[in-house]
Swiss-Prot record:
Requires Mg(2+) for helicase activity. It holds the Pfam family RecQ_Zn_bind. It is an enzyme of class 5 (isomerase). It catalyses: Couples ATP hydrolysis with the unwinding of duplex DNA by translocating in the 3'-5' direction; ATP + H2O = ADP + phosphate + H(+). Residues 535-615 form the HRDC domain. NCBIfam families: recQ, recQ_fam. It comes from Haemophilus influenzae (strain ATCC 51907 / DSM 11121 / KW20 / Rd). PANTHER family: ATP-DEPENDENT DNA HELICASE Q1, DNA HELICASE RECQ FAMILY MEMBER. This is ATP-dependent DNA helicase RecQ. Residues 229-374 form the Helicase C-terminal domain.
């Protein structure tokens, strides 16, 4: 780690603002940060709910540098600890971690740092922090502050409940003079109350920030030919970093292989792989050696890669919290990012079937509530951002103009006759076939199974041949959403059945408006590019700065975003700083990073400016 006398000077009499500027390289606080930091410095416990990408980590890292003593950071994931420690060390901060991934020799080195008082921050797992051996070790240090990251893990209402978190309620008794800060990006009201109850927080400062991530565009793509749709979307990203989530290991492997066959740098990641292989995939992704990771939900929590430009869900997540957290791994640098959910009603029905196979317990009721909420989100015809925010108790009325519903509002038509055709066909084939078969009968397809079952002789055979398969898929989905048709998952295949509500439609007793099938929502993305994070930056210089960053990162054996993130490089490409004073005005460039990395970037910028000047003179 860099042992710089400059850092000692910076933190000799630190204030929150001086640490923010000198160590982390930012000129001002983001909304909520300063009040949370001041609460900690005043000795208050705090509950902080702050969206990913809004600077949650700084809320405890800055007080840690202001306090005279050790800060404990309790974190659930080994890879997350290492990633955060790497970033702190890049800023010249004495930080380290203790966990099961280390050798005995490595653990002893950390323990020696603790005993000698070298460390400002120590990251540790929840299962380790409450052990007698850890208390004995920590007795050599003055613990002045405790941060509990991913605090939603303490709550059974949370989407990622971890039993080991429940023992953290004893921290307040063990360290009565140390303020405790519990932080999370995903906690509804019930989860927030659970966190407070378990942790016994006193003299509380509560900050519930906005859950909005305005730089992320939310899009739902109805599945027609899902693998083709996904491939088209990934290829349109033109080499940008992204994560694709699936619900099964087999699907992860198949999609990764299919993308590689299309020329995409893609890797699979799931719990069935050897640990060493998973670690290699994660490292390759962090270091921009792999473009796309196709993963189960196990991937992503352990990294803070800032330049993930898209997250795609090939399957429906089990809760809005999971969806929000997973999509939140995109755009952490505040630059535009895409979140695409590929969906069909069978996805929801399948998750419902799995859930109902569990014993009937209070936990199953919680999971049912969360599953229904994500189903409502997927089927909504209103602004997706408003649905998301409303779930977390943040009520807004103004549509976002940055989701598929806002960019391409559904167009309505009189759908009564179409609905009657679909329902009649479902009824005539015995309510024991799925959507594909019903559509084949509707469209009069010459299908061997249809002929074997004599369904080509039905009165409904071919009554929908004037419209496309995609049209009828859309009609069936909407009838499911509206409750006129239900999809029943059996051990064999999903089947369509009529509900009691279908009678009024079949009899024509009520009007029915349906939405016209939309062209691919993904194609709308291509025609509605998002705003760029920094206006008027030199794109050629930005590309050269990224290449230089990759060279430095590989040499230092760290991920590129730990050197400087994309937003910082865009500012450099706009303002073109060539002196230390100018460089320190760039967000994300602190004194330590300037000392460690600044010179080659300024040299490259100087060279680029000379090239531009020569070109202008020649004109």
């Amino acid at each position: 780690m860099l042992d710089s006398p400059l850092l000692s000077k910076i933190i000799e009499k630190p204030t929150a603002l001086s640490v923010l500027k000198s160590v982390f390289g930012y000129q001002s606080f983001r909304k909520g940060q300063e009040e949370v930091i001041n609460a900690a410095l005043n000795g208050q416990d705090a509950l902080v709910v702050m969206a990913t990408g809004n600077g949650k980590s700084l809320c405890y890292q800055i007080p840690a540098l202001c306090f005279d003593g050790l800060t404990l950071v309790i974190s659930p994931l080994i890879s997350l600890m290492k990633d955060q420690v790497d970033q702190l060390q890049a800023n010249g901060i004495e930080a380290d971690f203790l966990n099961s991934s280390q050798t005995l020799e490595q653990q002893q080195q950390v323990q020696n740092k603790l005993i000698s008082g070298q460390l400002k921050l120590l990251y540790v797992s929840p299962e380790k922090v409450m052990t007698n051996s850890f208390f004995q070790l920590i007795s050599y240090s003055k613990v002045c502050f405790i941060a509990i990251d991913e605090a939603h893990c303490i709550s059974q209402w949370g989407h990622d409940f971890r039993p080991e978190y429940t023992q953290l309620g004893g921290l307040k008794a063990s360290f009565p003079d140390a303020p405790i800060m519990a932080l999370t990006a995903t906690a509804d009201y019930a989860t927030q109350q659970d966190i407070l109850r378990h942790l016994n927080l006193k003299n509380l400062h509560k900050y519930i920030g906005s859950f909005d991530r305005p730089n992320i565009r939310y899009t739902l793509e109805e599945k027609y030919k899902p693998m083709e749709q996904l491939t088209r979307f990934v290829l349109a990203q033109k080499g940008k970093s992204g994560i694709i989530y699936c619900n099964s290991r087999n699907k992860v492997e198949r999609i990764a292989e299919s993308l590689r066959n299309k020329g995409v740098s893609a890797a699979a990641y799931h719990a069935g792989m050897e640990t060493a292989i998973r670690e290699r995939v994660q490292q390759d992704f962090q270091r921009d050696n792999v473009q796309v990771v196709v993963a189960t939900i196990a991937f992503g929590m352990g990294i803070n890669k800032s330049n993930v430009r898209f997250v795609a869900h090939f399957d429906l997540p089990r809760s809005i919290e999971s969806y929000y957290q997973e999509t939140g791994r995109a755009g952490r640098d505040d630059l535009p990012a895409e979140a695409v959910l590929f969906y069909e009603p069978a996805d929801y029905a399948w998750l419902q079937k799995i859930l109902l196979e569990k014993p009937e317990t209070p936990q199953r009721q919680i999971e049912q509530h969360k599953l229904e909420a994500i189903g409502e989100f997927a089927e909504s015809q209103t602004c997706r951002r408003l649905v998301l925010l409303n779930y977390f108790g943040e009520h807004r009325q103004t549509p976002c103009n940055n989701c598929d519903i806002c960019l391409d509002p559904p167009k309505k038509y009189d759908g009564l006759v179409d609905a009657q055709k679909v329902m009649s066909t479902i009824y005539r084939v015995g309510q024991c076939f799925g959507a594909h078969y019903v559509i084949a009968v509707l469209r009069g397809m010459h299908n061997q199974k249809i002929i074997e079952r004599q369904h080509h002789k039905l009165s409904v055979y071919g009554i929908g041949k004037d419209k496309s398969k995609e049209h009828w898929q859309s009609v069936i989905r909407q009838l499911i959403h509206l409750g006129f048709v239900q999809q029943v998952i059996s051990e064999l295949n999903p089947t369509l059945q009529l509900t009691e509500s279908a009678k009024v439609i079949l009899k024509g007793e009520e009007p029915l408006e349906l939405a016209m099938p939309r062209i691919s929502a993904i194609s709308k993305i291509a025609h509605n590019p998002q705003r760029q994070g920094v206006a008027n930056y030199d794109k050629d210089l930005f590309a050269r700065l990224r290449f230089l960053r990759k060279q430095i990162a590989d040499k230092e054996n760290i991920p590129p975003y730990i050197v400087f993130n994309d937003a910082t490089l865009q500012e450099m490409a706009q303002y073109m700083p060539t002196s230390n004073i100018e460089m320190l005005q760039i967000n994300g460039v602190g004194s330590i990073k300037l000392e460690r990395f600044g010179q080659p970037f300024m040299a490259l910028i100087q060279e680029h400016k000379a090239i531009l000047a020569n070109a202008q003179n020649n004109d």
